[in-house]
Amino acid sequence: MKYIGSCHCGNVKFEAEGEIASAMSCNCSMCQRKGSLLWFIPRSAMRLLTPDDNAGTYQFNKHVINHRFCLTCGIHPYAEGTAPNGDATAAINIRCLEGIDLDAIPVQHYDGRAH
């Protein structure tokens, strides 16, 4: 299935393709503050619909994940990084996807504080 996602103001917009079997709630210092529910897909399954420079990038801790946010409204719709197997990966904040029933998606909790 193809989903459209964006920040609040629409200056960062993308499409993501795949099936959302579950989402991840992480308690690391960043995710806890953002309140994201993450869906991981290959980076090749995500396509930006707006210019890349509409989004800022924030890194912390080990500096291996590019947390992307809208420079206008500040919403964090996705992040980019590398999976343990070396594949380019996108972490989509499913709260930013259109037409999603969050109550229908199982949520797995990840102890990001411990890692």
Give short role names for the model-derived ranges.
Residues 1-115:
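A short Gly-Trp-Pro
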